[in-house]
Amino acid sequence: MFKTERMDLILEILHEKKHATIDYLSKHVFASNVTIRRDLKKMEDLGLVIRSYGGVTLMDTENKYVPLIIREQDRISVKNQIARQAVSLISEGSTIFLDGSSTVLCMVNYLRDEQNITVITNSLRVATRLCEKRIDVYCTGGKLVPEALVCVGPYSETMIESMTADLMFFSSQGLSADGKISDFSESETCQRRQMLQHARKRYFLCDSSKLGKSFLFTVCRTSDIDVYKRQVSYRMRMR
């Protein structure tokens, strides 16, 4: 098993248990205690976990902004699976809004070099990777959020308002039981709302860690979008 796969599995376990011993992780990840300790040291450096004597606890990321570099490492295998299926929904010649979420960032890996699409994004990471693939991309500009490398604010919103996309792909931090999609970042929520208003079809990408959670700022409700793709069955819910 590769290191990233082990770390992803450890995070899966901690999302369920919150705390686990080294011996427990070694048994369920099928790796030695030495390997587990090495992985946990790396995960602690990334701000994903807190190590303690003989065990580890999942870092509490509720109600605070989590930097993109940390979100990129969290549940990466699941995000890649969702991203791969999301990309399969894109038709040639489409114009697409992509937000700055880590799940959407994974989508770029599955786009072909020189694919015949046009992307509008407020994410510098997304824009840079698309340029490397020689895919047409518009970056909205605006005030840069260092932790997320996304552009926000009125300049960004004005550009989004001036454009129309066939598709929008986005994620957020929470999907409550009553269908509210929400996030802790006010500025990124505003960007997503603008994109939602100017896209013909909207896709919400959601893994199980987001289910049952609610944050301060509401992006939209599931009744406001056309499709959402979620972990496990990847069920597509049509409005």
Enumerate the predicted regions with their spans:
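Conserved phosphate- and dinucleotide-binding cores of soluble alpha/beta proteins
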Residues: 2, 12, 19-24, 30, ...
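HTH-adjacent hinge/linker in prokaryotic transcriptional regulators
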Residues: 2-29, 34-100, 108-116, 120, ...
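Generic beta-structure capping elements
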Residues: 59-61, 101, 140, 172-173
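Conserved SAM/SAH-binding loop
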Residues: 104
